[in-house]
Amino acid sequence: MEKLIVAEIVVTPIGTTKTGLSDYIAKALDEIKRAGVKYQLHPMGTVFEAADLETAFKITKACHQAVIKAGAKRVLTTLRLDERLDQPRTMEERVKRVMAKVK
């Protein structure tokens, strides 16, 4: 059976000279786009789909390094993984199933 990993990544540059982080986040998002995976940016992070753990880790590393390359002196990266083995469910399917139950 095909599996699908849904990952949420939050890359936070620390000790930058300005309060806005969009320049750094855009660099990380460029790496996710370059990987060619489906993703959704939200106000507090980014969710993406990966075929396997190696791909999820590779994307996470690329995002982390992109923020360092953009000038961050310290970076805090948080990764949450949901690997469902019985039935692959896309990001959209997961949201749709919950919203169908909201009254």
PLM regions and their residue ranges:
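Charge-rich, low-complexity N-terminal segments
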Residues: 1-103
